Amino acid sequence: MSDDAPAVPGLFTLVLHTHLPWLAHHGRWPVGEEWLYQSWSASYLPLLRVLRTLAAEGRSHLLTLGMTPVVTAQLDDPYCLTGMHSWLANWQLRALEAATLRTSSDTTPACTPEALRAFGARELREAEHALDEFATLWRHGGSPLLRELVDARTVELLGGPLAHPFQPLLNPRLREFALREGLADARQRFAHTPRGIWAPECAYAPGMEDDYAAAGVGHFMVDGPSLHGDTALGRPVGDSGVVAFGRDLQVSYRVWSPKSGYPGHAAYRDFYTHDHVTGLKPARVTGRNVPSSAKAPYDPDRADAAVDAHVADFVQVVRRRLIDESERIGRPAHVVAAFDTELFGHWWYEGPEWLARVLRALPEAGVRVGTLTDAVDDGFVGDPVDLPRSSWGSGKDWQVWAGDQVADFVQLNAEVVDTALSTVDKALTQHASVGTPTPRDTVADQILRETLLTVSSDWPFMVSKDSAADYARYRAHLHAHATREIADALGAGRREQAQRLADGWNRADSLFGALDARRLPR
């Protein structure tokens, strides 16, 4: 802490939510595996690098990191690891092409040969470092690296249900199964069972806290409006003892706001402007209304200065918020800023560097930084509260996942889940023998696996936001078809055909290998 920055009351927690849908084996570009590899290279590699560096400096309790089972499965999958290595090698080749470019028909300022050569040289160094780092550290997947950070208490890990379903609309049996299997998946990968979860889409329905308590979950995230904006303390929900933490919108929107958030600053790398020869992003934002054809070349020194300015601004915002909220409630307050992990690096190129600097700067400015578990253990918990049905989507309700635009998804999901549960129940009953354990049924396992992929919250979100909506509809109906196809064969007594179908679908959808239909609540 510097001499001119006295300690402020309370605790600040940064929460990052890491999630992508299952993309392996389901398309390459523009939506599919390319989405995974871009996020991995731009966000996950830099974030782990930042956290490992800060841990080596002796820092701990830095942030709370949500890792959904479906994204962790891809970070550990041999197919994805091989694909990521190839993607990084291709990035290196594209950077080399830019660094040696002599002529170009593109006359935009950021894509002239001179500008691209300078940009390409920097990009080449970055790609070479990323490829070397990946080959050295990631050869066994992401879980060993994350486990090191959890064991060192660098981060707190949040878990979540398998495949990221919108829980309020899910059949209670499948909802319980998805959550318990998701926590078991984390335990298997990290030798650690998370005390808290990031509820998919921060979605909540009254009574879900009891399900959480029964599964051993002690705390979860909601959006600020779910607590009517009073997020200064965690709040037990009803008499469950499970604590809901609300995202502080005033602090979070300082970073993550389409109109005034840091990533839109003129100095930062522009996400949308590409060099069409190499696919690289050589321009800076330049201005909010500046077309891509007029954007200026990226200037790392200018961006670096902007990062420093935004670190200083954020630190002051957090200090002021902690002081104000502590005065308002008459006791030390807790401020939670929560973001998608992919914001840092993928959407906002400079985001990982901003994170590294802000996590150093906050303690120096007299701000205590800790995790959600720290907040519970240290008493940053207020009186019990009843929560409304809510989410962090548009309108803070369920409309993104249950509105008219996606009503067909709601019906599809209900039908597929009913089919899956009835088929699995029948199959397990037929296999059961008095006095002997029921054998594992990989056909029933695959039915549930495909069902969970069908009900992923990503598909209706993408349709509601008109973001790769055709791909989202294709994926939902593909997994629904897989569920029905296997279930129909099994229900008709064609066990061998059902096994062949299950094995075939498993070649594309082999995630959650420990998923066991025998643990489905009866």
Task: Kindly label every feature range from the protein language model.
Residues 4-63, 67-125, 231-522:
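Active-site and substrate-binding clefts of carbohydrate-active enzymes
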Residues 5-8, 52-59, 141-158, 187-190, ...:
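Acidic (Asp/Glu)-rich catalytic clusters
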Residues 203, 208-217:
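Hydrophobic, small-residue-rich alpha-helical packing segments that form membrane-like cores
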Residues 101-143, 148-168:
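Active-site-proximal, well-structured secondary-structure segments within enzyme catalytic domains
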Residues 175-199, 317-338:
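CE4/NodB-like, metal-dependent polysaccharide N-deacetylase domain
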Residues 218-229, 368-371:
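His/Asp/Glu-enriched short active-site or ligand-binding loop at hydrolase and phosphoryl-transfer sites
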Residues 194-204, 340-344, 468:
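Conserved short loop/turn motifs at secondary-structure junctions
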Residues 159-181, 185:
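Glycine-rich phosphate-binding "P-loop"
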